[in-house]
Amino acid sequence: MGPRILIHADLGRVEWRDSLPSCQRLAELIGWELVIVRRQAGDLMHRWETRWERNVARYATLECVQVILPWSTPSMRFCTSEAKTKVIASALAKRFPGQPILNVTGIRREESATRRAKPVCAIDSNLATGRREALVWNPIIEWPIEQVWRTIAAAGLTHEAYAVYGSTRVSCVFCIMSSIGDLRAAASCPDNHDIYRAMVDLEARSTFAFQGNRWLADTAPHLLDADMRRAVTRARLAAHERMRLEALLPRHLLYVKGWPTTVPSDEDAELLASIRRRVSALLGIDADYLTGPAVRERYRDLIAAKPERIAVP
């Protein structure tokens, strides 16, 4: 039997304040070392903020045709892959070089359709290499939620998210997968008010709701001052207009894997330029390529720069 550790990926401001102490209580109870890892480039809120800044810059230089949202989504969960999975795998690989690793998780089939299909045990693709065997083991995958609650309560390891505030799950305080009830539960905790306001501010600046069509701002509007409520109202209107305008874009003007596939006609280029002018004004983006000829020239330049050249008319 090799060394055993607990490992926790700290997500920073978006995490429940009781999450790290809960891990520490568990480590003390079972007598294992607790290893805490963090994304070196910044916490998850920083990731969303910088993603938005970069997406604005990409739109300004016509590196993308439509404005790209700042948030993670259920189909694009870089929050999990970058802030949890990768940093945990990296820490384990450095700590146990060349040694076999058994990675034990607490996922359960009841949690989602994806997890319902997970095996009890499998090769851990994030850790396994030609020189290292690695398995991921999901020992409680069949457990119903009631058994989870009983086990936690018996160990005296309850978490404030559900014990105090009534959340049905412990994740980021405001998670892209959260129900409206869990979002409200998180907002009822005073510790979460600052991050709530920061996330609503990003909704307002970006014109993208946190969960598709569900605005986080609607969860606890009483926590927002008058200026922020007005900013959210403007953002909703701008979002509706942005989506209406972008729906006018012909599909052949959209990029495929980040690259244009054809140079637009004069008519299409003028249409795209017109949409870019209006969207840029809505979002306050200082964009280039706002005339038809400039758009055509930009497409030509990008096509010329693409590794596999496309015939330019």
Where are these regions (language model features)?
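Nucleotide-activated chemistry modules centered on ATP-dependent adenylation/adenylyltransferase
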Residues: M1-P313
